[in-house]
């Protein structure tokens, strides 16, 4: 049979019903196979027709499967053949006849379905018995098609196009599926004003990602549903266009345009009752464009200009500029409505409004302190995204995490059960032994197991009871939510009896039960309230900043910063005090919060602790000495090397890779940045530092603004080092600083120096300082050896020897490190490799005349 004039979906149904016969080992291809294939087709057209008539597709499928199972199975060997039955061919021919009589150029799947109602075999009888006849089906097809003819091979794609390629936002509002919208009244009012115009009544919402553009549409849908809009919009529906569904599966040229035209045709026929919402409006420009074909935006322009299409677009400012503004004809048909980022206070209001939705979804409770923390902490610490999206994400993730914890065993109970399993394994092993010690151990373990089993049973009982109470509370919340939706519907329908019953009877009763359930003590086994600490924990995981930095009293922590830094850096009290004061000023909030936490220029000779202080500062502030970006400025001696910091300009190799400085800070906004040997860099490089030091921001080569507000900038230099090396202990510090600053001012411009928080001098180390450093360095070596279970001991004479030999005023502490390597570490390494020192040994180091002696104690 020739099926050239069948649509692609119809051909697929015919192929599938043939495969079904082969799969079931049936010799004939019957109308029953055709009916089974139609009931399983993917477009949903047949299901829509059956629902329209009042049939039940699931019941039909069951009856068809029952009849298919009755057909005899025949094992067809290589010489056998499966053939179409006369009845099956008759049905297909009838479908062709019906299509021709209806004025269709192609036979569609609904025409095949209609032809089955004329069938006298079991397939036709099943349809008749379920109330599906040719008359009812013809009326349902007419209603589905809305007068359209099947004149293309993809005709089915144009049926009910809005339902297929769109989402009814107003219907979602009606069913209570949308979150409440808080604080966007001005933007919604502006959109309503534009929609109420006679011509070019098409607003486009422009704003950064995550500020709530789509939420404004949902708010408008809720207002339309509540009839809180002008009369011109009261009967409107908002349909969100799914551009992905429009494009998907459009194999042939012109098919995409056909689908879009069918959508626009339905909108036009609605006489202004449908408002089309296109999220990511810029996707329309160029979509569907092939050689000589028009893109989607050109199909919209005529209807937009005539006012036949009510359309709301949403896009970001960058994409609007890049795509929409370039097409002036499209841009002038839309009226921009700018959507700004809400303030922290507005975000808190938004979060309070949607709180119940998240509590209901995750079956947890959200404290108000968690809401405030989500808004304030996300604004302070997550700088590359926008409110309220980033705050909502924090609440959502914290709730999700708690939900997972609630569904698993409490930690205490889990540890108890693991201990029980461990004891059972030990008992099984000990029962194989017959000695007295094993018998005593079995007795003690049996007694312990008995106690633990009893404790585990009690805790399990309490845990299950607590879980049951939480599940009961969750069920009551769902009932309360549904009751409120029913109340809204009853009030709108003026069903006063039902509204009164819900408002004064059912809802108060559920609320009383819910309050009683929430007040029940769960014995501390389950934590169900999301708190400020949970939000802070999520922030900590996202950004890498330690949680205690945000929640512990920073006043107490920062008051002891000198003490903590002095444990690592010796002999630089003035430098430690200067950097501590600057950090305290920043953290106490009495300086500009838009600047870095601190910016310092460390001046001093080599080996006096400039870099070590920077590492110690990173360890104190971020609990990680490696939270440090070290940039060796001797690598930036040429003017063009500045591009390595912020990224290569457009058109150059490496443009898409970003810069060393900007990319590191984007990925980890909380770190100490060390510009080492800064005087060796080209002077033009300091021009980019001006905006970092002053505004706490820097724009990279791709136009992305990188936030430096949570970094500490440290620059080190050897300028004036010879003055500091030759400084006498009783010499006036201010005089020395003036002499050093003359060198500094000769190299750096005043506007650069003026933006630094502190210029700190590092003085040369004296013998007492070296002695303290010896103890620190040997302490580090002691920790390393302890990992191998080797104990290192040293007496006063060894410390004095190392301090004397390692002291060099010109080179600071670095010669000491080399001395310890040469005198101690090299000898220890040889002894360990030779087997003289092994795990469990104690190694004593003492001075013997003019050298160190290593003594090994077993």
From Swiss-Prot:
Location of the protein in the cell: Cytoplasm
Keywords linked to the UniProt accession: ATP-binding, Chaperone, Coiled coil, Cytoplasm, Nucleotide-binding, Repeat, Stress response
Residue segments, region NBD1: 160-341
A GO MF label: ATP hydrolysis activity
Subunit structure: Homohexamer. The oligomerization is ATP-dependent.
Family to which the UniProt record says this protein belongs: Belongs to the ClpA/ClpB family.
Listed name of the protein: Chaperone protein ClpB
């Amino acid at each position: 049979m020739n099926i050239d004039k069948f649509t692609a979906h119809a051909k697929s149904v015919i192929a599938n019903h043939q495969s079904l016969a082969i799969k079931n080992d049936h010799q004939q291809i019957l109308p029953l196979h055709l009916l089974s294939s139609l009931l399983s087709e993917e477009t949903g057209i047949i299901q829509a027709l059956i629902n329209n008539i009042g049939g039940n597709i699931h019941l039909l499928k069951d009856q068809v499967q029952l009849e298919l199972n009755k057909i005899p199975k025949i094992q067809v060997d290589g010489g056998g053949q499966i053939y179409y039955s006369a009845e099956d061919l008759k049905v297909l021919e009838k479908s062709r006849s019906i299509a021709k009589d209806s004025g269709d150029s192609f036979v569609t799947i609904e025409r095949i379905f209609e032809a089955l109602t004329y069938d006298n075999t079991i397939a036709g009888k099943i349809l008749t018995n379920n109330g599906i006849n040719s008359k009812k089906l013809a009326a349902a097809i007419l209603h589905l098609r809305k007068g359209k003819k099947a004149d293309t091979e993809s005709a089915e794609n144009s049926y009910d196009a809005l339902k297929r390629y769109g989402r009814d936002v107003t219907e979602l509002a009606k069913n209570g599926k949308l979150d409440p919208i808080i604080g966007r009244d001005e933007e919604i009012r502006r959109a309503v004003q534009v929609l109420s115009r006679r011509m070019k009544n098409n607003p486009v919402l422009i704003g950064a990602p995550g500020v709530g553009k789509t939420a404004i549409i949902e708010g408008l849908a809720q207002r339309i549903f509540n009839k809180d809009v002008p009369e011109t919009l009261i009967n409107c529906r908002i349909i969100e266009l799914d551009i992905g569904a429009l494009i998907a599966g459009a194999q042939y040229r012109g098919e995409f345009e056909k689908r879009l035209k069918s959508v626009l045709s339905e909108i036009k026929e609605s006489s202004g009752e449908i408002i089309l919402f296109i999220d990511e409006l810029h996707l329309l420009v160029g979509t569907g464009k092939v050689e000589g074909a028009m893109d989607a935006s050109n199909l919209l322009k005529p209807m937009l200009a005539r006012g036949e299409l009510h359309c709301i677009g949403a896009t970001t400012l960058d994409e609007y500029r890049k795509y929409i503004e370039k097409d002036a004809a499209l841009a002038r048909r839309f009226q921009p409505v700018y959507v700004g980022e809400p303030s922290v206070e507005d975000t808190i209001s938004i979060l309070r409004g949607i709180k119940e939705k998240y509590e209901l979804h995750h079956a947890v409770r959200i404290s108000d302190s968690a809401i405030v923390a989500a808004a304030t902490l996300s604004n302070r610490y997550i700088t590359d995204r926008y409110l309220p999206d980033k705050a909502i994400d924090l609440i959502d993730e914290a709730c999700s995490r708690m939900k997972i914890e609630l569904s698993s065993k409490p930690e205490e109970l889990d540890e108890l059960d693991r201990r029980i399993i461990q004891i059972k394994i030990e008992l099984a092993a000990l029962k194989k032994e017959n000695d007295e010690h094993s018998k005593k151990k079995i007795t003690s373990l049996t007694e312990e197991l008995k106690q633990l089993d009893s404790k585990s049973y009690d805790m399990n009982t309490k845990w299950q009871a607590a879980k049951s109470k939480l599940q009961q509370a969750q069920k009551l919340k769902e009932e309360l939510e549904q009751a409120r939706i029913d109340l809204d519907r009853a009030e709108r329908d003026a069903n006063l009896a039902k509204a009164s019953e819900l408002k004064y009877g059912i809802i108060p009763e559920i609320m009383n039960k819910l309050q009683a359930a929430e007040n029940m003590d769960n014995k501390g086994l389950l934590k169900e309230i999301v708190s400020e600490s949970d939000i802070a924990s999520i922030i900590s995981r996202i950004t890498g900043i330690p949680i205690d930095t945000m929640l512990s009293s920073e006043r107490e922590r920062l008051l002891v910063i000198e003490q903590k830094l002095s444990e690592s850096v010796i002999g630089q009290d003035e430098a430690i005090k200067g950097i501590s004061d600057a950090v305290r000023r920043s953290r106490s909030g009495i300086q500009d919060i838009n600047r870095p936490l601190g910016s310092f220029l460390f001046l001093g000779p080599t080996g006096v602790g400039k870099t070590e202080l920077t590492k110690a500062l990173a360890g104190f502030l971020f609990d990680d000495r490696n939270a440090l970006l070290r940039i060796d400025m001797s690598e930036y001696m040429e003017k063009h090397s500045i591009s390595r910091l912020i990224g290569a300009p457009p058109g150059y190799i490496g443009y898409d890779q970003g810069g060393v400085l900007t990319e590191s800070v984007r990925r980890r906004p909380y770190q100490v940045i060390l510009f080492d040997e800064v005087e060796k860099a080209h002077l033009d490089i300091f021009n980019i530092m001006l905006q970092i030091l002053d505004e706490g921001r820097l724009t990279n080569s791709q136009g992305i603004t990188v936030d430096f507000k949570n970094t500490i900038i440290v620059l080190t230099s050897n300028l004036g080092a010879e003055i500091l090396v030759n400084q006498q202990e009783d010499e006036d510090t201010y005089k020395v600083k003036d002499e050093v600053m003359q060198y500094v001012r000769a190299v750096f411009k005043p506007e650069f120096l003026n933006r630094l928080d502190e210029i700190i001098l590092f003085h040369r180390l004296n013998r007492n300082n070296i002695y303290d450093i010896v103890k620190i360095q040997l302490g580090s070596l002691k920790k390393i050896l302890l990992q191998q279970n080797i104990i290192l001991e040293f007496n006063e004479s060894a410390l004095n020897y190392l301090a004397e030999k390692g002291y060099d005023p010109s080179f600071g502490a670095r010669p000491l490190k080399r001395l310890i390597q040469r005198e101690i570490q090299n000898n220890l390494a040889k002894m360990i490799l030779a087997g003289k020192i092994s795990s469990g040994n104690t190694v004593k180091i003492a001075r013997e005349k003019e050298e160190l002696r290593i003594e090994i104690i077993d």
